[in-house]
Amino acid sequence: MAVVVAVVVVVLVDTWISGYFLFRNASNDPLERADAIVVLGGEHDGREDFSIGLAKQGWASTVVISNPYPDGDPVMERVCHDVRGDDGPVEVLCLVPSSLTTRGEATMMRTLAAERSWNKIIVVSWQYHLPRARLIFRQCFSAEPGVTVMQAVPRRYQFSPLSWEFVYAYQWAGLAKAIAQGECS
């Protein structure tokens, strides 16, 4: 029994320490002008407004918001319309990916980019999601360096240590799943 407890403790500590360094301290890519900004689904934590703000500043002329939310979602109703930016109009598209996953969002963006001849996109998500999103977009959007620019929603995460442990375990599992799935067809 003591061996089992020791193994569990080691796994939990290892998950927390490695997760802290890989996920909690994930870095943004330097912002570059892009064809579009894609907002990955998740919680309404300011990511929609942050992304539209980037577009208004001229970083892209189109914002694609992944919309896995139910009809009548008040945030989506507020943000799902074109706006005016410093460089002219900003197109806002709210689309439901065929699969409500990061992989589904990357595949949706690959199709949209091909249809619209886009070469570069900015991807917005949680800071701790960036490593996994970066891998999945390399697998399913483009493996070419510099084609996807990863940006975290600028916010502070007020999680308890136990909540962080769950976040890290979830991200590690998602990373393992993405590696196992490999490239999108």
Segments (PLM) and residue ranges:
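A structural signal for short, hydrophobic/glycine-enriched beta-strand patches
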Residues: I17-E165
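A transmembrane-helix-recognition feature enriched in membrane-embedded lipid enzymes
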Residues: P161-S185
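Hydrophobic membrane-insertion alpha-helices, especially the h-region
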Residues: M1-I17
